[in-house]
């Protein structure tokens, strides 16, 4: 099946229906995966899928749909139905599609190495059996993906991508006797990521997966903050790379369409100002495994620095968001971000904490519009006088996300690279534990 030909036929079908502007994406994905279930290899399979996404505008009214039947007859039916859907949509002069954009990206291993997948799965199982036998891999996957797409618009844009990459993921818990002999279970945790070279390192050493599995075995027995610290206190958190990615997602949301259009962004009028610790340098990496520098609305996404020594350099409204707000359009991609490593070795970063916790996962819910939040810290360990101690249970922290970005006092030299993001450990002061 010729994806470009399908996309061209779809554009023609929408034009026949009188669309003023349109965008189509024809895509095909081939997935090969080795699955692990309950610490045993369970399934080897290959699947293929195809999809066509249609978007049409009639008199400022937008409608979109997806279909898996890519025959000319199905395209005609879908285009007609889309016009009917648009008739019931609200008019919005900000709706539009890209014009004159062009790029062709081909990158990564396009053919699957099945032996690399089976070797990676076997290495994960061997690591679990020898290093973390009390931990169960509830679900695990070693996979190869080949993803192709052709994006065309009525404005003459043509953006194509053909990407290949490998993925690993592990999800599990640990179970064993506590100090009193009672069998207990840890909370769940997970890890994983994408790479273009699966054989360059052991599977357990990638994406922090091995460390995550070890930490689960230490989390069978937990303590509350009353046992560890005597009760409520104000202290520091050391955010793991996964928790740092969660923290930065709030920042991304603040500079994207929803917050900018609603007026709830705390940063809309602060471009050029220092909004975070001078230790923070946040930039794009839109050439990471499985990532193409193409925005969802059909624009080439150039390299971007969002934070430079804590200074906010730009907002990131989409084409629609820019037309809605009057702000400059900045094309971006959802994943592919990196925070620069710091000068502090991780061991020193931990030793600098008087009282606090290493936070594996940060569950903040939906922070208030000003950044206030109250959340549970998960897969976390107490730090007392620089020593990492017991796993914590039922522990909450209260604070403000914007303040956390400003209160970063150390950034580790080490980072974890999952493909979609590359993050260090970050120490933040002044959080309230309860």
Q: Where are these predicted regions, by residue range?
A:
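Active-site bordering "gate/hinge" segments
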Residues: 1-292, 308-309, 347, 385-387, ...
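Dual-mode signal for accessory low-complexity, basic/Gly-rich regions
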Residues: 230, 254, 268-434
């Amino acid at each position: 099946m010729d994806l470009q030909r399908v996309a061209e036929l779809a554009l023609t079908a929408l034009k026949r229906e009188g669309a003023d502007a349109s965008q189509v994406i024809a895509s095909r994905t081939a997935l090969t995966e080795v699955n692990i279930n309950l610490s045993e290899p369970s399934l080897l399979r290959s699947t293929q899928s195809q999809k066509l996404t249609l978007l049409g505008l009639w008199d400022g009214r937008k409608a979109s749909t997806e279909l898996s039947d890519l025959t000319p007859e199905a395209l005609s039916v879908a285009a007609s139905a889309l016009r009917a859907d648009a008739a019931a949509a609200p008019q919005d002069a900000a709706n539009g599609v890209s014009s004159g954009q062009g790029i062709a990206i081909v990158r990564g291993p396009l053919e699957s190495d099945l032996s690399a997948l089976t070797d990676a799965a076997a290495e994960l199982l061997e690591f679990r059996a020898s290093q973390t036998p009390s931990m169960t891999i509830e679900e695990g996957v070693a996979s190869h993906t080949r993803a192709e797409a052709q994006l065309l618009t009525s404005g003459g844009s043509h953006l194509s991508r053909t990407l290949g990459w490998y993925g690993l993921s592990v999800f599990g818990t640990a179970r064993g006797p506590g100090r009193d002999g009672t069998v207990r279970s840890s909370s769940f945790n997970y890890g994983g990521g994408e790479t273009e070279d699966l054989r360059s390192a052991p599977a357990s050493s990638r994406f922090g997966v091995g460390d995550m599995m070890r930490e689960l075995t230490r989390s069978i027995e937990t303590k509350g903050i009353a046992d560890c610290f005597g009760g409520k206190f104000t202290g520091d958190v050391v955010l793991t790379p996964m928790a740092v990615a969660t923290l930065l997602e709030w920042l991304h949301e603040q500079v994207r369409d929803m917050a900018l259009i609603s007026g709830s962004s705390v940063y809309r009028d602060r471009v050029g100002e220092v909004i975070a610790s001078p230790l923070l340098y946040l930039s794009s990496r839109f050439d990471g495994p499985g990532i193409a520098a193409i925005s969802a609305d059909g624009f080439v996404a150039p390299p971007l620095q969002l934070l430079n020594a804590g200074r906010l350099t730009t907002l990131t409204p989409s084409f629609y968001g820019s037309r809605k707000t009057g702000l400059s359009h900045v094309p971006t991609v959802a994943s592919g971000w990196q925070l620069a490593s710091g000068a502090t070795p991780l061991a020193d970063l931990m030793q600098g904490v008087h009282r606090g916790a290493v936070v594996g996962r940060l569950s903040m819910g939906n922070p208030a519009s000003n950044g206030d939040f109250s959340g549970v810290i998960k897969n976390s360990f107490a730090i007392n006088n620089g020593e990492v101690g017991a796993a914590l249970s039922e522990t909450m922290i209260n604070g403000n996300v914007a303040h956390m970005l400003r209160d970063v006092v150390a950034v580790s030299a080490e980072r974890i690279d999952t493909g979609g993001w590359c993050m260090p450990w970050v120490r933040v002061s002044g959080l309230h534990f309860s």
